[in-house]
């Protein structure tokens, strides 16, 4: 099976999706979800009770609001440990952390210091939540670290040019 599953901007959850994710993480999988996920059901009706719908316990948080930035407006996400920061634009989701641990926080605006990325241990696995539409370098570096920790080996050791995808079967 898969060691890591990435679900970016998974706006709509089809029936049964939450249970599949729950079992995957409980059994040791690594799940990565981003902002604007679990907002509606398969009928495009808003999920009641909070988002990400049906996975708040797995993710260890509840979304409270999302700040849509104007064109050209940016914010910063800063690592909780270390001196690393990245720019973000378009979307900055605010979350209320329950059991998740912040890995990155926002650096500016009224939500400075609030989580921009979290990790939650659930069962035998981990669930990561990316709250910000950060620059590509953020995703390259963070995903590389998560995938390595999960024990996924790269098919090629050298850098892969932009626009090229490498997969193994």
Question: How would you describe each model-predicted region?
Answer:
Residues 1-3, 120:
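Aromatic-Pro/Gly-enriched surface loop or interdomain linker
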Residues 8-169:
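A conserved amphipathic helix/loop scaffold
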